[in-house]
């Protein structure tokens, strides 16, 4: 087994899976069938995702879609050395996690991983890897305002442009695809004007850092929004499994 998990964590996931999936018995049968043929790592990851997944996603997406995230993430875990330094709770919540915002789940994780693995696998630190990922994001998309539903990573890469919420969705997805815990943060209203912004936080080498998605800097914890964010009355970060 690649994942070194405490027995108590595995028991917690198992219990939550059985209780939560009782609301969707037909989907549970499909998930159980997939899990039965999976190895131990795949099984526990699949159970975790379904154990904390929103009911709308449970019924809306085929088991194979969710399984694609599990397989891509475990493939990455086996081949990217620094991924094994990520604590289990962060791995499940901020790496394995399939959703960032309200984007479609588009099975993009494996594709992004293949795009990035050779650029990050030999990086000496996770900070260096995170910076490289953001350079890749900058190569794929730039900013344009919009009010439509959040584009998924494939949509962003195909259109090559999107608002800050879509740029950060792409960046979080890219970070997770190569084993860097990441989450989207946003301010619903700035203190100084009637506007908002979203950016990315990553866990690298033991600490959380922020960065502007698709806005690469030579270091983390730097962005055009630094001063404004320090004055914000409310900063949100939601966990979407």
Report the location of each language-model feature.
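Hydrophobic/aromatic-rich core segments of domains that either
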Residues: 114-121, 125, 129-135, 140-154, ...
């Amino acid at each position: 087994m690649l994942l070194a998990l405490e027995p108590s964590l595995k028991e917690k996931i198992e219990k939550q899976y059985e209780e939560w999936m009782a609301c969707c018995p037909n989907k549970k049968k499909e998930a159980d069938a997939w899990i039965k043929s999976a190895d131990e790592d795949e099984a526990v990851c699949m159970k975790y995702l379904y154990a904390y997944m929103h009911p709308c996603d449970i019924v809306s997406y085929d088991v194979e879609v969710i399984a694609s995230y599990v397989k891509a993430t475990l493939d990455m875990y086996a081949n990217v050395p620094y991924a094994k330094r990520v604590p289990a709770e962060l791995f499940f919540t901020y790496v394995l996690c399939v959703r960032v915002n309200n984007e479609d789940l588009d099975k993009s994780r494996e594709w992004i991983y293949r795009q990035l693995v050779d650029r990050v696998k030999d990086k000496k630190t996770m900070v260096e890897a995170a910076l490289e990922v953001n350079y890749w994001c900058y190569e794929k998309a730039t900013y344009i305002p919009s009010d439509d539903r959040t584009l998924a990573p494939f949509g962003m890469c195909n259109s090559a442009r999107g608002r800050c919420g879509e740029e950060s969705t792409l960046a979080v997805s890219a970070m997770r695809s190569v084993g860097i815990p990441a989450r989207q943060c946003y301010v619903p209203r700035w203190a100084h004007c009637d506007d908002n912004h979203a950016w990315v936080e990553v866990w690298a080498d033991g600490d959380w850092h922020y960065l502007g998605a698709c806005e690469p800097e030579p270091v983390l914890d730097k962005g055009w929004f630094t001063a404004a964010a320090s004055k914000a009355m409310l900063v949100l970060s939601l966990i979407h499994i």
